[in-house]
Each structure stands twice: as C-alpha cells, then as structure tokens.
From Swiss-Prot:
One GO biological process term: tissue development
Record's bilayer topology term: Single-pass type I membrane protein
Expression across tissues: Predominantly expressed in the neuroectoderm and paraxial mesoderm during embryogenesis.
Disulfide-bonded cysteines: C218-C229, C222-C235, C237-C246, C276-C287, C281-C296, C298-C307, C314-C325, C319-C337, C339-C348, C355-C366, C360-C375, C377-C386, C393-C404, C398-C413, C415-C424, C431-C442, C436-C451, C453-C462
Compartments (UniProt record): Membrane
Cellular component, GO, one term: plasma membrane
The protein's name: Delta-like protein 3
Organism: Mus musculus (Mouse)
C-alpha cells in the first residue's frame, strides 16, 4: 500500500488555491417588514389556533430562470430560514393585526455567478408553542411565488404580495462578497496596480486605480503589480508587461512593427493586448478604452460590465398590481409600467392612499377596500361619490296642512297652527306659552292667536295699559313680563293720541268692509245662547266651550255648544262670526 506524502508547503499552497474557490460569490438578502391581514381581503383570525401562542418563521428559496417553476423543485440557488422571530401573542379567535418584524432579515449565500433572472419563493411557517400544542409542530401558513430580475449591487427593491387573506411586505437585494465584483459577481478584484514603463511606439501606460482591498485570486505567481484577473486562475497583464505571469517588461528594441524583444533575445514579440482586443463586450455592446481599462456601451435591454446581464422586458411581467407594461421610450429603459389607479412606482409596487384625495363629496365617508373605492354617503345624498342631492320631501308629505321644508340633506315640517311634531301629527296648544300679558286670556283662531285683555289693557298681546281717569298711558310692559304682574307703564300723551287715531281709522275701515244688512250674513253664526258681545262679555261667552261630536262644519252650518264637564282641559278653537263685528257702537266701545 502506497501512501501519499504531502509536504506542509504543498498543503499550504493547495489550501491557498482552494480556499478562495469555496468563498461565496455573493449573498441574496430579503428583509421582511410586516405580515398580516390585507385590506379588502376579509378579516383573518390570529395565525395561532386555539391551542395557544405560536411563532412565525419565513423560508426563502431561490431558483434559477424566469419561468414559473414547480414549488417542489430544488432551490438550486440557495435557501435560508429566518431567525430571531418574536412570539405571536395575540389571543386565539381575535382579529389579527400586522406583525412587524424588526429583525426579519434572511440571507441566502450563492457560490456561482448571480444569474440576474430567478424565481423567488417565500413561505410563512407557523410553529405551535405551549404545553398543549399537540399535532404537527410546523404548519405552512402562506406561500408567495414570483419571477424577478435583479442585478447584484443595486439598491433595495420593495414589494408587496398577497396570498389568501394575508399580505406580506418585504424588500430584497443581491450583493457581491469580496473579492467578487460586478453585476453578476463573476469578476474578481484585480490586484493593486503600479506605474509601468512604456517604450516609444507602444500604447500609453496608465496605472489602474485600486478596485478593492481584497487579495487577488488570480493564477498562482501572477504579478501583483503588473497583472490582474477577472476569472479564477487567470493572469492578464497591464500595459508594458507581458508573459504568462506578467513579469516580462516590454522595452524599446530593434524589433519592427511595434514588436518587442522576446525572452533571452530569442525573437520579437507583439505588444501586450489592449483592453478592447477581441471586443469583451457581449450581446452587441461596443467597447471603448478608458485610462488603460475599457467600458462597454450596452444595447437596450442589457447591462453589466460586459453587457452580460439581460435587462427586464415586458415578457417578464415586471409590472405589479395590474400595471400595463409597454416598451420604454428611453434607450436606457427596457420597459415602462403604467400603473392602475391606486398604485405608483417604477413597477407599480407602491399603494397610494386614494382617500387622501377626498373623492367623496358632500361629507361622504371614504372607504378604501383595496380592490375598489367606496363612499358612504350622508342622509339625503347618493351616487358613487355622493354627488346627487336627493329630494328629501319627495314622497313624504306633512300631515294636517303642514309644509315640507328641505335643506342641508335633511327635511322638516312647518306645521299649521295647533299641530306639532316631526310630521305635524301631534296636537299642540298654542296658548301653552301664555302669550297674553297682564292677565289676558288666550284663544286659538284659524289665523293666529287671539288675546282677550283684562279691563284697562289693550293691544295684540294686551301689552298696552290705559288708565280709566284719562291720565297719560304707559308704554308696553317689557318682554318677559308675566300676565299676573301688576306693574304698569304710561304712554306719553302724544303717543296715546296717535295710537287712538290709528285704531279709529282701522275700525272705520273694518266697518265699511264688514257691515252687512239682515239676511246677508254668510259667515259662521253666533253661538246659540250668547248675548250681544261687548268689550267684557265676549270673551266670557266664548270661554270654555266645546263642539259636540257629530256637529256639522262649513260656514253656514249651525253648531250646538255645551259647557264641558269639570276637569276637562282641552283647548278650544273658535272661529268668530262676522256678525260679531257688525255693530259700530261695539267697535267704538272696544277701541275707546
């Protein structure tokens, strides 16, 4: 049996060569912001069932390609599980709120070059806790699967996904681990450059700036000063240097056509290759030399150092939430997303608070249901945006001669005398407020209230006092004076004469209009059994009278009136007959 002996120096060299190959090219990072019920998706219960509290974990799976792969396929690019997730402590059966995850970072390392196109699978798992958990300890609560395009080294991309009644908010990015760099993490950091010496007829020598501080993983022996690499086990020379390890300087010699001397003066060599020799730009990109290096001008739809990463197109479905994808007019943009109402962002990934625009009119309440916008209108308004003012009085009239008045989205009834309430269906006593002053008696009339004044008082509400001895009258009692208040106020002589003259003129006009001869009286007849009215006897004769049931109505019908029984306090409504005012002497007696 032959044993293989490896010296310590050889072991060191082998480890130095293999160790960089085991380092990850980069890492995919996913930050979970919140997990909870989504708007308009129902009211989910707590993720913990009735067996006790639980804890949520998130599993991230990365698969190559842009096609929708089966969820059972392997996570070829890598997978990871979240850690340090807080315990969900809501009581079972209660509505679930959004679960914030301050430490919800999931890291998925990848060893090969980042493909740029991949499928992202995010699974939410529930771990049941407590002594009475029972059953399986782990249960799959939700799964999100989507296609993505992403270049390494770019900013965080934010996304919102819904599944069932749950909504997941997260961000993700891909970044390279040193010494890998580039959009695909396939280019390794070149070693530190140094000034070089260039001879006449050769390309100008400009040292490369340092691209990173990590050690080189180039071909063993590659000059750290004059060589660099973009792939493992590679050694590419800077301007002015040549050879397999970039250790042979290019100097001036007798060689023609820009050739340089070979090793040990065995011949002439061509100058070192230029950065754009062979066109390192892929997918039709054009190369240009810049300070000893090169830059690729990529065609539309590609990016990266060598245009090796394919850009996102509308065929990949980059627009979320129903956004419409069209080809971008900007040559640097492969697509443009036209977002539906309620969403914004380059990929329509951000939700807009549509209620902040106040779409509901006339004080309506705005409700954003996620898939639609609803307005809850106030009473008296209708329409999708509460823009229609309804006729509040349509189809609903006021009773007993009341008039409907609308305004401000509501309606009210202006009731006739003797009625009240919302629809004028309730009897009202107009004399309940005792409007007649100085002991005057109140009676209800079809045209308003009638006050029968006590001796020595006059006016619509018995507000004027007249002294019997002819002294100056006093002015009306102040507002709010009670009927039983014995206080009196005198009118000035000039004002008293003016009032008397005005009343006399009004009386003559009434006499002229109202006066009729015998047989011409078509108004309501005098109540049976009453005496000829006078200033004092008329109110007493009409007081506390009641119309019997079944009495006729109309201006020419006669009615029998009786005195009510004791304890009857119903209001009396009297329509005076025109014959009451037919005597001139009575009118003059009342006025004067």
């Amino acid at each position: 049996m032959v044993s293989l002996q490896v010296s310590p120096l050889s072991q060191t060299l082998i480890l130095a060569f293999l160790l960089p190959q085991a380092l990850p090219a980069g890492v995919f990072e996913l930050q979970i912001h919140s997990f909870g019920p989504g708007p308009g998706l129902g009211t989910p219960r707590s993720p913990c069932n009735a067996r006790g509290p639980c804890r949520l974990f998130f599993r991230v799976c990365l698969k190559p390609g842009v096609s929708q792969e089966a969820t059972e396929s392997l996570c070829a690019l890598g997978a990871a599980l979240s850690t340090s997730v807080p315990v969900y402590t809501e009581h079972p059966g209660e509505s679930a709120a959004a679960l914030p995850l301050p430490d919800g970072l999931v890291r998925v390392p990848f060893r090969d070059a980042w493909p740029g196109t991949f499928s992202l699978v995010i699974e939410t798992w529930r771990e049941q806790l407590g002594e009475h958990a029972g059953g399986p300890a782990w249960n799959l609560l939700a799964r999100v699967v989507g296609r993505r395009r992403l270049a390494a080294g770019g900013p965080w991309a934010r996304d919102v996904q819904r599944t069932g009644t749950w909504e997941l908010h997260f961000s993700y990015r891909a970044r390279c681990e040193p010494p890998a760099v580039g959009a695909a993490c396939a280019r390794l950091c070149r070693s530190r450059s140094a000034p070089s010496r260039c001879g006449p007829g050769l390309r100008p020598c400009t040292p490369f700036p340092d691209e990173c501080e990590a050690p080189s993983v180039c071909r063993p022996g590659c000059s750290p000063e004059h060589g660099y690499c973009e792939e493992p086990d590679e050694c590419r020379c800077l301007e002015g240097w040549t050879g397999p390890l970039c250790t042979v300087p290019v100097s001036t010699s007798s060689c023609l056509n820009s050739r340089v001397p070979g090793p040990a003066s065995t011949g002439c060599l061509l100058p070192g290759p230029g950065p754009c020799d062979g066109n390192p730009c892929a997918n039709g990109g054009s190369c240009s030399e810049t300070s000893g290096s090169f830059e690729c001008a990529c065609p539309r739809g590609f990016y990266g150092l060598r245009c090796e990463v394919s850009g996102v197109t509308c065929a990949d479905g980059p627009c979320f939430n129903g956004g419409l994808c069209v080809g971008g007019e900007d040559p640097d943009s492969a697509y443009v997303c036209h977002c539906p109402p309620g969403f914004q962002g380059s990929n329509c990934e951000k939700r807009v608070d549509r209620c902040s625009l106040q779409p509901c009119q006339n004080g309506g309440l705005c409700l954003d249901l996620g898939h639609a916008l609803r307005c809850r209108c106030r009473a008296g308004f209708a329409g999708p945006r509460c823009e229609h003012d309804l006729d509040d009085c349509a189809g609903r009239a006021c009773a007993n001669g009341g008039t409907c008045v609308e305004g401000g989205g509501s309606r009210r009834c202006s009731c006739a005398l003797g009625f009240g309430g919302r629809d004028c269906r309730e009897r009202a006593d107009p004399c309940a407020s005792r409007p007649c002053a100085h002991g005057g008696r109140c009676y209800a009339h079809f045209s308003g209230l009638v006050c029968a004044c006590a001796p020595g008082y006059m006016g619509v509400r018995c507000e004027f006092a007249v002294r019997p001895d002819g002294a100056d009258a006093v002015p009306a009692a102040p507002r709010g004076l009670r009927q039983a208040d014995p206080q009196r106020f005198l009118l000035p002589p000039a004002l008293g004469l003016l009032v008397a003259a005005g009343l006399a003129g009004a009386a003559l006009l009434v006499i002229h209009v109202r006066r009729r001869g015998p047989g011409q009286d078509t108004g309501t007849r005098l109540l049976s059994g009453t005496r000829e009215p006078s200033v004092h006897t008329l109110p007493d004769a009409l007081n506390n009278l009641r119309l019997q049931d079944g009495a006729g109505d109309g201006p020419s019908s006669s009615a029998d009136w009786n005195h009510p029984e004791d304890g009857d306090s119903r209001s009396i409504y009297v329509i005076p007959a025109p014959s009451i005012y037919a005597r001139e002497d009575w009118l003059i007696q009342v006025l004067f």
